[in-house]
Amino acid sequence: MFMVLFGTVVIAGIVGYISEKSGFTQLVLASSGGIDSAVVCKMACDAVGPTNVHAIRMPSIFSTSHSRDDALLLHQRLGCWDYEVEVEHQSVVNMLNTRFSQHRDDPANLVTAKLKAQAYAGVADENIQARIRDVYVMHFSNAYGAMPLSTGNKTESACGYYTHFDMNFSYAPIKDLYKYQVMEIARGAAEIPDNIWQKPPSAELAHGQIDEESLLSYAILDPIVRAYVEDYISTFARFDRWV
């Protein structure tokens, strides 16, 4: 019941921000088929009505078929506008590597040395996908007049588990919700397909990527983050293994 009330407060916040500060009547967000974007999409539809919400699916080669299907099913259940734009990030990466290799004959050049040693950072290939998605959402916002929503939660922000420059949005509905709170809201929302909150959370920026393998289990991580952020526990504090 508490999380239902909490979700209602968040929805009221969206309505208040739109009506009093933003000047927008339409909302746009990136919808991946994951739990965070599903909850934000649900809140947006409850706040302004589904016909005023534009959800963009932007799959890449790493997106699973069930994520695509889950996002589409969510949009159909909510009744919001659905769009799909493929993220062709590899062609962008290849173009950039070519352009940045202009000094390939000079061994002192940073790019030349990195490519020759095959020390090119794979994380760059992951992050550019998120940034391309950001460009698509912001273009939709600028071109058609819809306020862009962030889908980041408090746990990710506190841990720095997001792509830099991928947070360029006007409003972040779940920025004060820990992951476990987002999960509770998702479980209580009939429109959100069960598979969205039952599957392991993943950014899907690489094959087989799972959030909790990069971080910790959210059941362990959330209480620790909350202790640091809200209870001001010292960074030198130690936690029992069961936490």
Regions found by a protein language model. Give the residues of each.
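ATP/NTP-dependent adenylation/nucleotidyl-transfer catalytic domains that generate, transfer
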Residues: M1-G33, S37-V243
